[in-house]
Amino acid sequence: MSEQGSYDIQQVLKALPHRYPLLLVDRVKSMDLGERIHAVKGVTMNEEFFQGHFPGAPIMPGVLQVEAMAQAAAILGIETLELAGTGKLVFFMGIENAKFRKPVTPGCLLDLEVEFTQKRSRVYKFRGKASVEGVTTSEAEFTAMIADPPA
């Protein structure tokens, strides 16, 4: 498949329906359509979840790292299938083998690397890894489907 250059936040917003406070992809660094994506999330102290996770020792929840990987996967799926702007949504169906390795704290640049592992009709499987400065912070496999938004 073809290699795509980086996507700024405006292109991310066109591909994803997510908005603040749950938009967890800031930029796409590279994408090989139909294969893989490398996106990033700048983690700042301004994130709402740091108010309660944990006061005095802020750590990004692992489930939000998985959500960030899923959003990167959604961009990959939407762009691969040329569905940006059609209103189609990517819905999470399952998470498997999630592992949380290292904490992510304010000031980190979270790298999100996701690849397709299986493609069938409207159901897709992905493998993702989140890392900071080359150190894996979390990883997971997940299943998603592409569908019309709920009526």
From Swiss-Prot:
Active site (record annotation): 53
Family note: Belongs to the thioester dehydratase family. FabZ subfamily.
Highest taxon of the lineage: Bacteria
Xref: Pfam families: FabA
Subcellular localization: Cytoplasm
Name by which UniProt lists this protein: 3-hydroxyacyl-[acyl-carrier-protein] dehydratase FabZ
GO cellular component: cytoplasm; membrane
Catalytic activity: a (3R)-hydroxyacyl-[ACP] = a (2E)-enoyl-[ACP] + H2O
Gene designation: fabZ
Enzyme type, top EC level: lyase
GO terms under biological process: fatty acid biosynthetic process; lipid A biosynthetic process
Organism the protein comes from: Erythrobacter litoralis (strain HTCC2594)
